[in-house]
């Protein structure tokens, strides 16, 4: 089979900002023994951690629970694609990253807000099942370094969560402990009255977690003095193919969804690989050196791109 590619490192970011909201209090998640409300930070300590909870591996999550979470996330991925595909140009998004970021809000939501988030993100599990399941999937993709398997050479995957709160807002300790324990998200204090400094602090965090590939995630004007909470999720992925492409890049024709021909730089190789087909499409599977990771590429039949999109 003859394959061509123009792939580059994948970087996905989910960012959520919230205006004033009710302080979290949950009967489902109790404070850790010995956990006490964090002391108000001083102005010069605006990046101080506000929960001592460490990111922990969950107790065994049943396979059926993980399967239900994965199925819902797949449905959400298609829902989101249909919503954003109308914009021109190429797009890259990480449904799991978005689900993880919004789940950190969902943990503190109740009533109608909780219901609407669950409907939009296809969360069908109860909260006390959902968060441990998300934690299990996240740790499977990006295990903590102590005792973790050594990644294959040429493989990099980093998943990081952060939460930034208004310095004088009364966030509840059980909520902060949940974010630290389940999502590894330590809250940092910011004073959003100084929107520029807050923006720079968060952007520096994102830049650090994406090896400098994204330096200006939050544009001027997004944060205001009314902002109370910012949640950020960053994913950085770069890996070598199991079977490398030949170093022979050349100009080749490519056909975007609009059917027009453009010329792009491509590499190619002939190889045995996973292949499948169905009504109106063909698909191939490309393996990375790290056996956990594979890329599936789907090619709709010529002239049927929009019809194929509608079928998703």
Where are the model-predicted features located?
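Detector for small/aliphatic-rich hydrophobic stretches
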Residues: 2-12, 16-192
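Mature, solvent-exposed C-terminal subdomains and processed small-chain segments of exported/organellar
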Residues: 301-312
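Non-catalytic, conformational "gating/processing" segments within enzyme and secreted inhibitor domains
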Residues: 34-40, 44-48, 88, 127-303
